[in-house]
C-alpha cells in the first residue's frame, strides 16, 4: 500500500534528488553565490548552495526560472523586495505579512515617493492592531486606503508590471528576522495569477 501511495503521488514531488545536477550557473553577478541547478527541462529551479547573507547573492532573475533559498536572517522580506525592484524596474506591490515594522513601512513609502513602487497594497493579520499598535497606526496614517486586515499568517509579495509577474513566498515577515528563513521567488505567470486572484479577493473582503 505504501508503494502504491508513493507511485500515485510521485508526480506531486517538486524536486527529485536524483535529478539534481551539480553544475554551477554561469554569467552571475560577481558577488552572487554558486547555484545548484536542476534540469531546466524538468523543473526550472535554481537552488542557492549556501545560506544567503544578502539578496544580491541570488544573482539575476530569469523569467521562467524560480529561485529557492535560505537566508541567515541578514535581510528581511522588504529588503528582498527592493532587490527584485532593481531588476524589474518600477512595479506594483501587493504584500501580505503577519507582522510589520515602522522601518519597513517608512522604506516602502520612500519607494512610492521615488516612483520605484507604482502602487502598494497591504494584507496584514488582525492581531497587528493590538500587538504592534505603533506600526499599525503608522501604516494607517501613511497608507490610509491601501491596507486590509484579516486572519492571516501567509508571507507573500507580488511584484508586477508590463514585463514581470513575480511571486515571493517564504517564512520572512516585514520585520527584522535574525533567524533562519526559507524563501522562493517564482517568475512564472501561472503562479502569479493564482496568487493574485486569491489575494485580490482577500483584499476586497478584508476590513480596515
How would you name each of these model-derived features?
Residues 2-208:
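PLD/PLD-like phosphodiesterase catalytic module centered on the HKD motif
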Amino acid at each position: 500500500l505504501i508503494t502504491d501511495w508513493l507511485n500515485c503521488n510521485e508526480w506531486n514531488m517538486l524536486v527529485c534528488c536524483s535529478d539534481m545536477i551539480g553544475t554551477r550557473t554561469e554569467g552571475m553577478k560577481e558577488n552572487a553565490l554558486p547555484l545548484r541547478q536542476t534540469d531546466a527541462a524538468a523543473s526550472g529551479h535554481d537552488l542557492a548552495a549556501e545560506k544567503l547573507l544578502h539578496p544580491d547573492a541570488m544573482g539575476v532573475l530569469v523569467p521562467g526560472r524560480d529561485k529557492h533559498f535560505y537566508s541567515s536572517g541578514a535581510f528581511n522580506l522588504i529588503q528582498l523586495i527592493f532587490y527584485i525592484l532593481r531588476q524589474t524596474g518600477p512595479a506594483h506591490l501587493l504584500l501580505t505579512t503577519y507582522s510589520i515594522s515602522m522601518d519597513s513601512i517608512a522604506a516602502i513609502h520612500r519607494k512610492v515617493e521615488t516612483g520605484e513602487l507604482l502602487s502598494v497594497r497591504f494584507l496584514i493579520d488582525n492581531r497587528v492592531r493590538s500587538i504592534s499598535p505603533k506600526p499599525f497606526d503608522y501604516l494607517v496614517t501613511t497608507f490610509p486606503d491601501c491596507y486590509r486586515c484579516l486572519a492571516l499568517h501567509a508571507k507573500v509579495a507580488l511584484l508586477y508590471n508590463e514585463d514581470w509577474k513575480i511571486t515571493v513566498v517564504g517564512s520572512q515577515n516585514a520585520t527584522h528576522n535574525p533567524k533562519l528563513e526559507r524563501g522562493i521567488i517564482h517568475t512564472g505567470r501561472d503562479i502569479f495569477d493564482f496568487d493574485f486572484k486569491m489575494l485580490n479577493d482577500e483584499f476586497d473582503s478584508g476590513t480596515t
